[in-house]
């Protein structure tokens, strides 16, 4: 049997005894200097409390209207959750508490978690909070917004429903960077629904998810026009841990440039939210304009728009094929770099070029042209027999085109 401090009701009785006017007008709400409502657990330890510097109590309706209410939920006798709002309505002796106006629910700990909303219903006996207007849950570096949220306190579970959006919280990002070339905005991943355990950090969204990234430097769209994303990501779900700063995207995973100039098809891919990186240590395929690519491992830097293949890089376009241990290319500029055991093969004259490093760039026709500035290369050709391939003028050697 729980114990409830009846300070609210006792204060109402004292006020009635001390004021004859109040007795004649019992239907009118009464003003109190303060509200102090407390509940204990079966062992006598504090379970929760609600305080307010000013409240009005309606005896007949058993309602208390409080200004600037402040609540605390205890665990093992110690404060665990803090609750704050601009206004509150207490029903009975605390069966339900309606909170309104910038509601903040703070989970205490080494890395506090905050859940905010415009309104919330606190049901202490069910250990449940329902945030049904613009709920937002955020920790130090990540943020989830949705249409509705239910926080089951004892189960350490927040159910976010109504197209929840997971993103890197920009206010927590490092301010370092080049102001002349602003980085793209953080990737936002929209799910059908999300379950999150804020204390442990576990997060799951088992249905299809879609991520979008927008270029910060693009001009603002017209008033009725929605901005177009520069990068689109899809996966069959996600699972991860926000306290550890990662989410695993469930295969198959697709990353697409909105301009149609590049794509990646991958298996399970990890999204390091805090570092804004996508990575996978499983084989993938892709294409960049006319250039096909595949490799055994990749990383996408979402801030720099760089794609890095750190093992088993292969690039191919009609008549040419390049292999290397590592490759790096930048999507917006179309610049490439291949390093470590680079081998470029061309069908023309069966040319084979070996180098430690080759650079390249996507041309206007969508093909890549590579060069080796300041690097030594070794090329081998197989020339056709004399009399084949034309005669007469001596042709200049062809550039290393890829």
Language model segments and positions:
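Mature-chain termini and adjacent capping regions
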Residues: 1-402
């Amino acid at each position: 049997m729980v114990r409830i401090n009846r300070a609210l009701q006792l204060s109402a009785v004292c006020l009635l005894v001390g004021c004859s006017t109040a007795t004649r007008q019992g239907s009118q709400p009464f003003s109190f200097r303060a509200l102090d409502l407390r509940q204990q657990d079966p062992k006598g330890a504090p379970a929760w409390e609600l305080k307010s510097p000013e409240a009005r109590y309606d005896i007949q309706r058993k309602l208390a209207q409080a200004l600037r209410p402040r609540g605390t939920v205890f665990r093992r006798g110690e404060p665990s959750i803090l609750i704050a709002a601009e206004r509150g309505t207490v029903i009975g002796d605390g069966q339900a508490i309606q909170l309104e106006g910038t509601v903040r629910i703070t989970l205490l700990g080494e890395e506090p978690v905050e859940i905010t909303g415009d309104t919330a219903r606190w049901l202490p006996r069910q250990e449940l909070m329902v945030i049904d207007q613009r709920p937002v849950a955020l920790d130090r570096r990540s943020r989830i917004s949705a249409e509705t949220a239910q926080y089951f306190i004892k189960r350490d579970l927040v159910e976010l429903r109504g197209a929840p959006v997971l993103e890197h919280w920009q206010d927590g990002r490092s301010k370092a960077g080049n102001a002349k070339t602003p980085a793209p905005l953080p990737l936002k991943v929209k799910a059908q629904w999300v379950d999150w355990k804020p204390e442990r950090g576990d997060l799951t969204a088992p249905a299809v998810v879609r991520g979008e990234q927008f270029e910060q430097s693009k001009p603002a769209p017209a008033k009725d026009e929605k901005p177009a994303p520069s990068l689109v990501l899809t996966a069959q779900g996600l699972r991860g841990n926000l306290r550890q700063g990662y989410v695993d995207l469930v295969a198959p995973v697709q990353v697409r440039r909105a301009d149609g100039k590049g794509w990646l098809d991958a298996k399970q891919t990890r999204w390091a939210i805090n570092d804004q990186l996508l990575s996978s240590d499983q084989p993938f395929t892709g294409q960049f304009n006319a250039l096909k690519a595949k490799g055994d491992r990749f990383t996408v830097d979402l801030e720099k728009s760089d794609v890095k293949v750190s093992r088993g890089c292969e690039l191919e376009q009609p008549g040419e094929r390049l292999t290397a241990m590592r490759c790096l290319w930048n999507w917006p500029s179309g610049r490439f770099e291949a390093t470590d055991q680079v081998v470029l093969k061309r069908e023309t004259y069966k040319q084979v070029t070996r180098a430690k490093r080759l650079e390249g760039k996507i041309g206007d026709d969508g093909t890549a042209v590579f060069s080796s500035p300041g690097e030594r290369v070794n090329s081998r050709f197989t020339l056709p027999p004399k009399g084949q391939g034309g005669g007469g003028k001596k042709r200049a050697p062809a550039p290393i085109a890829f």
